[in-house]
Amino acid sequence: MWFKRIGLFLLTNILVVVTISIVTSVLGIGPYLDANGLNLSSLVIFCFLWGMGGAFVSLLLSKFMAKMMMGVQIIDPRSASGAERELYSRVERLARAANLPMPEVGIYHSPEVNAFATGPSKSSSLVAVSSGLLQVMDNAEVEGVLAHELAHVANGDMVTMTLIQGIVNAFVMFFSRIISYALSTMVKDEMQYTVRLISNIVLSILFSILGSIVVAYFSRTREYRADAGGAKLVGRQNMIAALEKLRRTFDAPEDERGKEALATMKISGHNKWMALFSTHPPLEARIAALKNSGY
């Protein structure tokens, strides 16, 4: 499995470099940059290293950051009891069924009805659920949510999305610097640095926003796969029941679910007005996909 991931990583990197080279060649950018003192090869390498490197550093730190930012309390199976012990046992059983190493299991205290999985690899992953989810969902629905999150781990979605984010980062850095450099050559010498700096910041923000649409699209496709994987583990009806409960929860009036129990970027999403930027498909679409599947 690791050989496949390394191969995918290397192939992706090669494709990024080749694509950038083709684009710059077609547009005739290379000779122009060389004539104005900007080495294209060095820029490609710089953007690639920083773009991909930054994404993978984030992946390596993902468990630590999730625990710190969400206040996740890791369950110790040796001392756990009651609901915590039951949650741990469910994850343990589902992980075994999915042929996965046992992930860390945690709970974070929040009224939101949500869960997430993170971590740099299948052997170093974390599955966490909110206290609000445990209060609202019954056993079958909780298992559906856990199966969905473990399917993310089994599918290697954290690594896949990191690769995609790294590619987007590399392109954002490359083209923002190319365009800002070109703009700076159109003004007087004393203004070039200021123009290059400001335009690079503005373009980086703009391209990052556009790039997030690409990342969100791929994220939505992974959600459908995780739903399908979860259905294989616990059955289609349990997965549908979990998503139906989420839909009812988020359709409820705000005072019935708590002001903080709003849609987040984990298992549920309700960003209708920004559908292109949503990392999760609408719950209705996910439920329909499961109903039309053979799981």
UniProtKB/Swiss-Prot annotation:
GO CC terms of this entry: plasma membrane
Pfam families per the UniProt record, alphabetical: Peptidase_M48 (PF01435)
InterPro entries associated with the record: HtpX_protease (IPR050083), Pept_M48_protease_HtpX (IPR022919), Peptidase_M48 (IPR001915)
GO biological process, one term: proteolysis
Cofactor: how bound: Binds 1 zinc ion per subunit.
Cell membrane found in the keyword field: yes
Transmembrane annotation, as ranges: 6-26, 40-60, 163-183, 198-218
Binding-site residues for Zn(2+), renumbered to this chain: 148, 152, 223
Topology in the lipid bilayer: Multi-pass membrane protein
Similarity section: Belongs to the peptidase M48B family.
NCBIfam families, A to Z: PRK05457.1
Protein name: Protease HtpX homolog
